[in-house]
Amino acid sequence: MKIVERLQVVLGERSYPISIGAGIIQEDDIFWPLKPGDQAMLVTNKTLANLLKDKVFYHLRKSGIKIDQVILSDGEQYKTLNEMELIISALLEKKHARDTTLIALGGGVIGDLAGFAASVYQRGVRFIQIPTTLLSQVDASVGGKTAVNHLLGKNMIGSFWQPSSVIIDIDCLKTLPYNELVSGMAEVIKYAIVFDKTFFCWLEENIESILSLNHTAMSYCIKKCCELKSQLIALDERENNLRALLNLGHTYGHAIEVHAGYGNWLHGEAISVGMVMAARTSELLGHLKTIDFKRILVLLKRTGLPIKGPKNMSAASYLPYMMRDKKVISGEMRLVLPLSIGKAEIYSNIDKNIILTAIKHSQ
């Protein structure tokens, strides 16, 4: 029997458990609410089909689940409506009814595609998240945000659709290329900058242990991030105010991802640079102390994350992408800025010249 830590995302009738442990995807009772005789569709990508898919697929089949599968292409460039329609087609071809369950086995891209498909198939079916990347384990799998990209903007087509459960198996991280592990750390550091100075200090002391996949350090890291996000979602499920703080660095970072072409920059890499730009903006405005800015910079560098944007992307070219950000209201850009380590706020009416200067400092 594996040791499983459990958290609960409290959202009334949409509440669901988060299970965290090592080697837990083959535990008999882990796939709640599935039961023998239920229909399910496993959604994964070509890479994980060779690494992890059989562990889940055959375990569920042996458990009496009527399991089918659809294997998608791997990469951010495939987070599209066309790829999502492949899931819908597989559900229809295999005659899945409204009581089916989609199971997302993969990183943020698979989670988004499967979650969005679950939200629209026959007006909504259940889905289970099994995140396999650090980025998806600490962030993307929790909270119910699902989306696909558009050529003009990232995550512009989507919905809020909460999973029935989230199963975080730390052993899945062993399948990750090292740069993907590092990329995921950007979201971990984001939580610390925005919400928890003590956690930031802990990261400064334990970053090497996390990156070496030390079980104790990684378990604590993932659980802490999930706790912070769960608390926030319970207060603001649909990102009307507080939850938007989780977008630290994303307004700048998404501009990099779209401009460079989806998949050319890993999401966490772009967010790392975006957080540097946001921190520099805050410093220029007189909010963030220089000593805190430098601590953020040093931790990102020690993690192996980039702190400078693409050399072929001018500061001015960021602005059109940033104006298409989902936080824009009535034509006014809103940015999440750190005020200190452990505290952030949303600001609008920021002088564009300050934003441009902050971007130039990070090129």
UniProtKB/Swiss-Prot annotation:
Q: Offer one example of a GO biological process linked to this entry.
A: amino acid biosynthetic process
Q: Give UniProt keywords alphabetically.
A: Amino-acid biosynthesis, Aromatic amino acid biosynthesis, Cobalt, Cytoplasm, Lyase, Metal-binding, NAD, Nucleotide-binding, Zinc
**Top-level EC class as recorded in UniProt:** lyase
Q: Does the keyword Nucleotide-binding apply?
A: yes
Q: Which residues of the sequence carry a binding annotation for Zn(2+)?
A: 187, 250, 267
The EC number(s) given in the record are 4.2.3.4
Record CDD domains: DHQS
Instruction: Tell me where in or outside the cell this protein is found.
Output: Cytoplasm
Cofactors required: NAD(+); Co(2+); Zn(2+)
Residues that bind NAD(+): 74-79, 108-112, 132-133, 145, 154, 172-175
Q: What Gene Ontology terms describe where this protein resides (cellular component)? A: cytoplasm
Q: What is its main location?
A: cytoplasm
Cofactor note (record): Binds 1 divalent metal cation per subunit. Can use either Co(2+) or Zn(2+).
Cross-referenced SUPFAM superfamilies, in alphabetical order?
Dehydroquinate synthase-like
The entry lists its GO molecular-function terms as: 3-dehydroquinate synthase activity; metal ion binding; nucleotide binding
Assigned protein family: Belongs to the sugar phosphate cyclases superfamily. Dehydroquinate synthase family.
Protein name (Swiss-Prot/TrEMBL): 3-dehydroquinate synthase
Per the UniProt record, the source organism is: Buchnera aphidicola subsp. Acyrthosiphon pisum (strain APS)
